[in-house]
């Protein structure tokens, strides 16, 4: 089913860290705590004007003096103070939203599945064994200072080049990662907290995007 014909809820929040809680069966559950203060609608896109239906939401208060003039005008049009982060959510019920409307963490219900999008932790420059799970070279049988090397990266005169996509050493992490079908353990609407079973991408204090599960049943 196309996302244009489905209703989605998506909110920006901040990853606070992980903890453990007990469920109704006295089982210890690892959860990630995401703080989601109210997101505000700053733009409503329509098929007639933009070619598709979606809402733009903003998150994170900033000093209005630090916003540039185009951003200030955009937020003034929506009747809200400048925010730090913006994103779009395609949804079939875009017409039900209005500029300046606040969306809280109460939009998610315990027991439902969500997808969490974030930026993975940066690991710096890493070799092929850490970055791509290479096995490495034999520890003996004449191997000399080759134990963590990748091995051959291609032939010589034919094709006389290294193929694109060759797995090699390089910067690891710091990439956009989406974790699918995480279960919402509980919602604290008063404190703006969302507890999700399992781990989500990124370090503590990083921005994450939480939405209804795209592939969840």
Swiss-Prot record:
Keywords: Ribonucleoprotein, Ribosomal protein, RNA-binding, rRNA-binding. Gene3D superfamilies: 3.30.160.810, Translation factors (2.40.30.10). Transmembrane segments: none annotated. One of its GO terms (molecular function) is structural constituent of ribosome. Residues 137-160 are annotated as: Disordered. GO terms for biological process: translation. PROSITE patterns: RIBOSOMAL_L3. It comes from the Bacteria. The keyword Cell division does not apply. One of the primary rRNA binding proteins, it binds directly near the 3'-end of the 23S rRNA, where it nucleates assembly of the 50S subunit. Part of the 50S ribosomal subunit. Forms a cluster with proteins L14 and L19. NCBIfam families: L3_bact. This is Large ribosomal subunit protein uL3. It comes from Clavibacter sepedonicus (Clavibacter michiganensis subsp. sepedonicus). The gene is rplC.
């Amino acid at each position: 089913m196309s996302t244009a014909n489905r209703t989605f809820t998506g909110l920006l929040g901040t990853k606070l860290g992980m903890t453990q809680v007990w469920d109704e069966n006295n089982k210890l559950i690892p959860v990630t705590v995401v703080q989601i203060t109210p997101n505000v609608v700053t733009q409503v896109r329509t098929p007639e004007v933009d070619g598709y239906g979606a809402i733009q939401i903003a998150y994170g208060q900033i000093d209005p003096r630090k916003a540039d003039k185009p951003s200030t005008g955009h937020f003034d049009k929506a009747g809200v103070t400048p925010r730090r982060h913006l994103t779009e959510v395609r949804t079939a019920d875009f017409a039900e939203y209005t500029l300046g409307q606040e969306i809280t963490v109460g939009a998610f219900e315990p027991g439902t599945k969500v997808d969490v999008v974030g930026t993975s932790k940066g690991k710096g420059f890493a070799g092929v064994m850490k970055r791509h799970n290479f096995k490495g070279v034999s520890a003996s049988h004449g191997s000399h200072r080759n134990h963590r090397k990748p091995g051959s990266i291609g032939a010589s005169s034919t094709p006389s080049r290294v193929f694109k996509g060759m797995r090699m050493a390089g910067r690891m992490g710091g990439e956009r990662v989406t974790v699918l079908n995480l279960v919402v353990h509980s919602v604290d609407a008063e404190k703006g907290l969302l507890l999700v079973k399992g781990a989500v991408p990124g370090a503590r204090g990083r921005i994450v995007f939480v939405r209804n599960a795209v592939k969840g049943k």
